[in-house]
């Protein structure tokens, strides 16, 4: 793809998300979603092949269906309230339709089926945009209307997402699918705490974006897309491989890494609201994610292929031209847990 065309598409995606975040009018919100979707489709098809075409088609069908449900909810709310303002939610059916549309765009269970397939069919940099930046616009709109939506629907969908994100990643060998199921589980945690403390949900989103961006950057740096390829990179670039495994454990929420901080704060917030069974169930389901992350770490670093001493020579190692941005993201993704007291004060 021509770099100028790609730059225009990325600017359009940025503009669409910004419009959704800053607008208080339903028409502008819908317009921002459409700009985002139409610019994202060519980005998904950047590498022209049948898998990318199939992934872009699935993405378009899902997002178009969600947009139709969103427009239907907007029209019903307009009939009841007579206003285009986002905060003027006076219809229960409209809020339910809007919730369904937003969780479809986010990829929460039971509307999650498109996320692993689309992520697997596109390149790593397109998957990075899909699993990070594309979550911001639906979450920002849900943040604005969370007080008007049915909390029981969000509760059930978030629990299902945590469960599906754990179970779905157990037998996966493709790293992009593993990251997709990890995204589903993290979205479940964000939506769950949004019911009780929306600001904490934004903190969770920030840490998730940092960890996922670091993971995808390292995979692109290493040109790794499967667990088999990851296990073979140890003899070539052990430092990068070790960093990938540490970030995977951070995504799983293993202390004392950064990924433990949002889970810790979410469970603490739920217990403050006299909820005991719910955080216990969430913590047990989170062990599923941690299990397949630890299994991936074990198979990649502790069970290596038989090699000769010549393969471990210095001349075999690839030069590490790591950027400052990647280094900063990796550092935050691993060592942000000491900032937990400050985060508790702010949120």
From Swiss-Prot:
<dbReference type="Pfam" id="PF06444">
    <property type="entry name" value="NADH_dehy_S2_C"/>
</dbReference>
<comment type="similarity">
    <text>Belongs to the complex I subunit 2 family.</text>
</comment>
<comment type="function">
    <text>Core subunit of the mitochondrial membrane respiratory chain NADH dehydrogenase (Complex I) which catalyzes electron transfer from NADH through the respiratory chain, using ubiquinone as an electron acceptor. Essential for the catalytic activity and assembly of complex I.</text>
</comment>
<feature type="transmembrane region" description="Helical">
    <location>
        <begin position="59"/>
        <end position="79"/>
    </location>
</feature>
<keyword id="KW-0496">Mitochondrion</keyword>
<dbReference type="InterPro" id="IPR010933">
    <property type="entry name" value="NADH_DH_su2_C"/>
</dbReference>
<dbReference type="InterPro" id="IPR001750">
    <property type="entry name" value="ND/Mrp_TM"/>
</dbReference>
<keyword id="KW-0472">Membrane</keyword>
<feature type="transmembrane region" description="Helical">
    <location>
        <begin position="274"/>
        <end position="294"/>
    </location>
</feature>
<dbReference type="GO" id="GO:0005743">
    <property type="term" value="C:mitochondrial inner membrane"/>
</dbReference>
<keyword id="KW-0999">Mitochondrion inner membrane</keyword>
<keyword id="KW-0520">NAD</keyword>
<dbReference type="GO" id="GO:0006120">
    <property type="term" value="P:mitochondrial electron transport, NADH to ubiquinone"/>
</dbReference>
<feature type="transmembrane region" description="Helical">
    <location>
        <begin position="25"/>
        <end position="45"/>
    </location>
</feature>
<keyword id="KW-1278">Translocase</keyword>
<feature type="transmembrane region" description="Helical">
    <location>
        <begin position="178"/>
        <end position="198"/>
    </location>
</feature>
<feature type="transmembrane region" description="Helical">
    <location>
        <begin position="3"/>
        <end position="23"/>
    </location>
</feature>
<protein>
    <recommendedName>
        <fullName>NADH-ubiquinone oxidoreductase chain 2</fullName>
        <ecNumber>7.1.1.2</ecNumber>
    </recommendedName>
</protein>
<feature type="transmembrane region" description="Helical">
    <location>
        <begin position="326"/>
        <end position="346"/>
    </location>
</feature>
<dbReference type="InterPro" id="IPR050175">
    <property type="entry name" value="Complex_I_Subunit_2"/>
</dbReference>
<keyword id="KW-0830">Ubiquinone</keyword>
<keyword id="KW-0679">Respiratory chain</keyword>
<feature type="transmembrane region" description="Helical">
    <location>
        <begin position="239"/>
        <end position="259"/>
    </location>
</feature>
<dbReference type="GO" id="GO:0032981">
    <property type="term" value="P:mitochondrial respiratory chain complex I assembly"/>
</dbReference>
<feature type="transmembrane region" description="Helical">
    <location>
        <begin position="201"/>
        <end position="221"/>
    </location>
</feature>
<feature type="transmembrane region" description="Helical">
    <location>
        <begin position="96"/>
        <end position="116"/>
    </location>
</feature>
<dbReference type="GO" id="GO:0008137">
    <property type="term" value="F:NADH dehydrogenase (ubiquinone) activity"/>
</dbReference>
<keyword id="KW-0812">Transmembrane</keyword>
<dbReference type="InterPro" id="IPR003917">
    <property type="entry name" value="NADH_UbQ_OxRdtase_chain2"/>
</dbReference>
<keyword id="KW-0813">Transport</keyword>
<feature type="transmembrane region" description="Helical">
    <location>
        <begin position="149"/>
        <end position="169"/>
    </location>
</feature>
<comment type="subunit">
    <text>Core subunit of respiratory chain NADH dehydrogenase (Complex I) which is composed of 45 different subunits. Interacts with TMEM242.</text>
</comment>
<dbReference type="Pfam" id="PF00361">
    <property type="entry name" value="Proton_antipo_M"/>
</dbReference>
<keyword id="KW-1133">Transmembrane helix</keyword>
<keyword id="KW-0249">Electron transport</keyword>
<feature type="transmembrane region" description="Helical">
    <location>
        <begin position="122"/>
        <end position="142"/>
    </location>
</feature>
């Amino acid at each position: 793809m021509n770099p100028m065309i790609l730059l225009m598409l990325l600017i359009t995606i940025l503009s669409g998300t910004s419009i959704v975040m800053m607008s208080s009018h339903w028409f502008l919100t819908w317009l921002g979603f459409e700009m985002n979707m139409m610019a994202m489709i060519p980005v998904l098809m950047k590498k022209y092949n049948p898998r990318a075409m199939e992934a872009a088609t699935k993405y378009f069908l899902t997002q178009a269906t969600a947009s139709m449900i969103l427009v239907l909810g907007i029209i019903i709310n307009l009939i009841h309230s007579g206003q285009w303002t986002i905060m003027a939610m006076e219809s229960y059916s409209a809020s339910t339709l809007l919730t369904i549309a937003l969780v479809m765009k986010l990829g929460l269970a039971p509307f999650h089926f498109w996320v692993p397939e689309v992520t697997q069919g596109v390149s790593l940099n397109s998957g990075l945009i899909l699993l990070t930046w594309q979550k911001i616009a639906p979450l920002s709109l849900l943040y604005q209307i969370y007080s008007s939506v049915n909390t029981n629907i969000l509760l059930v969908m978030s629990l299902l997402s945590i469960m599906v994100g754990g179970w779905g990643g157990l037998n996966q060998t493709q790293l992009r699918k593993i990251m997709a199921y990890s995204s589903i589980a993290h979205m479940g945690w964000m939506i769950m705490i949004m019911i009780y403390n929306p600001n904490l949900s934004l903190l969770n989103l920030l840490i998730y974006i940092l960890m996922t961006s670091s993971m995808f950057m390292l995979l692109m740096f290493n040109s790794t897309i499967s667990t088999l390829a990851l296990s073979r990179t140890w003899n070539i670039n052990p430092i990068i491989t070790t960093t990938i495994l540490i970030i995977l454990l951070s995504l799983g929420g293993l202390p004392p890494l950064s990924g433990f901080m949002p889970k810790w704060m979410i469970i603490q917030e739920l217990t403050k609201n006299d909820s005991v069974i719910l955080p216990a169930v969430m913590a047990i389901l989170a062990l599923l994610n941690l299990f397949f992350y630890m299994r991936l770490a074990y198979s990649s670093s502790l069970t290596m292929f038989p090699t000769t001493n010549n393969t471990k020579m210095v001349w075999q190692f690839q030069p590490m031209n790591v950027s400052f941005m990647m280094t900063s993201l990796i550092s935050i993704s691993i060592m942000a847990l000491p900032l937990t007291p400050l985060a508790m004060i702010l949120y």
